[in-house]
């Protein structure tokens, strides 16, 4: 006797089998699969997709427009698709994103207060007010100009947060004073001594990498209660003949923890040097790519859409047409620059973009 086919059998698949499938999906496909039916949604709560890749979030250009609070999401692996977030609140529309970690965003509101926001769950963590820090730090300018300059005083903010416990640490530099940090449970901002003239900060695996304006380079261990300095040196790189063409330099921490100094040239090319060693120039990143603004490298493969041995950066070079709203890729092997994606500026305009890793917090 022929067995009658049950068209609804897909909704009754064992959760163990569904979990094996969910773990292999990209974030976009995982999100689609978990919305198929209640049974699949229930199974998805026990899974986290392994193919977690970086997406690009594009913030609207007019932060003063309270009706313009949705953002556009771009997945490098789906170049023909753009996603829109739901409209967020007015405060978010007027805030500026300064850093990302996973699906969490470090935001600065119009009064220069800091908070951490999860884009997908809408969880929010308000950080300690910084008003007392501004009062303690006298700029020697008029009160009006001091208020205008405060936003720029939050230099190179970085942070880390645990998706489950919500333990976190936030760090940033205050002009030529020092680096401040705050962890979950702290009642105020804390100082890290001997960190004046902060230029660039990076944070990875409980280590803070500090670069000063005058070539100083330090590493701090933040795994304990109090930050401990573990390394102190000058950043030495063999770049004397490039110096006059350098727009700026920035630190990058690779997947293996190697520290690089990346210099951006006036023609939008790049040079890469090692830090903490001979300062030799690097000509290949192997199978990794640099996300310049985030100061990290990612593995480049067919799954995540990134091109190996390349640098992904924002459009801020004078010889690239303004207002094209593009992100760019510089290939270290070919020494050529090309757009990551040409966004249609007639449909939307954005002021800045950040890489992040979309994820759900499943409980």
From Swiss-Prot:
It holds the Pfam family F-box. Residues 7-58 form the F-box domain. SUPFAM superfamilies: F-box domain. Disulfide bonds: none annotated. This is Putative F-box protein At4g22170. It comes from Arabidopsis thaliana.
